[in-house]
């Protein structure tokens, strides 16, 4: 029993090591090209066969990274909605969360922008699209609830405002990737925030 637990632990550690290596490769210059299993195996220091003992395909590796992104963002958005009741503060915190997560995880930002998925299965891009749609729905709900919570609605349609807020985040992430991570998504956020807030009328 103890041996079985130890084997599972080692297997989990190796899986994590493979995923961390893939994320690091996405952050490096390799991330702008197609990452092959041969390159990944060399980075991890194992054979390609060893990779496939932990993941049946490279697609499954990307699936695991996307799952981490989903869990990280969605769980933290839920915490924001639980702890913060004021609408504008909620929106601000959600934007900072998305931008900050990408900034702390440059390799994963290539997945969020779709750049790392250009050479992979379309299904993976579909998962990212669904994540953005889910976040947009949450933003729309936050905006819609303002009338109930605070007694006054926004002048503009909640769907329009939610898509505008998400488009801002996507644009900052795209800039981050395009500049090879030189311009951080949270850079000058405090200066930009009044411009964003001016749209929330």
UniProtKB/Swiss-Prot annotation:
GO MF terms held by the record: sequence-specific DNA binding
Any Gene Ontology CC annotation: bacterial nucleoid
GO biological process, one term: negative regulation of division septum assembly
Entry coiled-coil feature ranges: 122-147
Database matches in InterPro entries: DNA-bd_HTH_TetR-type_CS, Homeodomain-like_sf, HTH-type_Tx_Regulator, HTH_TetR, NO_SlmA, SlmA-like_C, Tet_transcr_reg_TetR-rel_C_sf
Pfam assignment, any one: SlmA-like_C
Entries under HAMAP family matching the protein: NO_factor_SlmA
Xref: PANTHER family: ACREF/ENVCD OPERON REPRESSOR-RELATED, ACREF_ENVCD OPERON REPRESSOR-RELATED
Recorded family membership: Belongs to the nucleoid occlusion factor SlmA family.
The protein's assembly and partners: Homodimer. Interacts with FtsZ.
Descriptive protein name: Nucleoid occlusion factor SlmA
Native source organism of the sequence: Proteus mirabilis (strain HI4320)
Gene: slmA
